[in-house]
Amino acid sequence: NVVSMIFQEPMTDLNPVFRIGDQGNEVIERHDGAGKSKEDIKARTIELLEMVGIANSEGVYKMFPHELSGGMRQRVMIAMALACNPRIIIADEPTTALDVTIQAQVLDLLRNLKDKINSSIMFITHDLGVIAEMADYVVVMYAGRIIEKGTAEEIFAHPAHPYNIGLMASKPVVGKQVDKLYSIPGKVPNPINMPNYCYFKDRCEMCVEKCDGAYPCEVSLSPTHKVSCYRYYDKKEEN
């Protein structure tokens, strides 16, 4: 009950043949149902639906998933994730299937709930805007490995790894006109035949001679900012 998860597409995670209330009740029965009557479990499910901003909670309790909008279905999934008061909520692209307006509402909801239940959220996303808005600490991955991590300010204002630098250069900036957005050259390595050197080397425009060696170890740029790149090994040797 310590870890809970919110998935990307609620329509594929909710069972289409069971009512919302039945599915919410089952979560509570399996994980937090000891000593609770059916009435108590129903009341808790309705309470959770209200907590995530569903006004007609008793009506939604009786509905099937197909009767709800995408945003409402995702709110139901969030309610089910909160059923056991988890310490960590893993949110895997929870707003990808939603339009921009509903996405903003769901992000606000998650932020408020995090503080309300004193929980932490591990947010998995490709959306840099969502990261900038939601994250306190950011871990950047490339081809399955962590290449840089730091506070949101460090990652966005002082990117260190060439891949992260490329990401920041490729995003549009308000008030700045460009003929063409930057695009990182090359392709991601084949996961079946990964190289034994830095996975980004073949796409990197900042390679140094050392990059031909083994996969680089992590280097600390600050107490919170760390990067796996040979370009910063001089700093590692100084430390």
What is the role of each PLM region?
Residues 1-8, 122, 197:
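ABC nucleotide-binding domain signature
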Residues 22-40, 50, 150:
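ABC-type ATPase nucleotide-binding domains, specifically the catalytic core motifs of the NBD
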Residues 39-59, 168-169:
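Conserved ABC ATPase "signature" region
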Residues 55-58, 149-239:
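Short catalytic/signature loops enriched in Gly
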Residues 63-68, 72:
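Conserved ABC ATPase signature
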Residues 83-87:
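A short, proline-enriched helix->beta-strand linker immediately N-terminal to the Walker B motif
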Residues 90-94, 98-179:
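P-loop NTP-binding/switch modules centered on Walker-like glycine-rich loops
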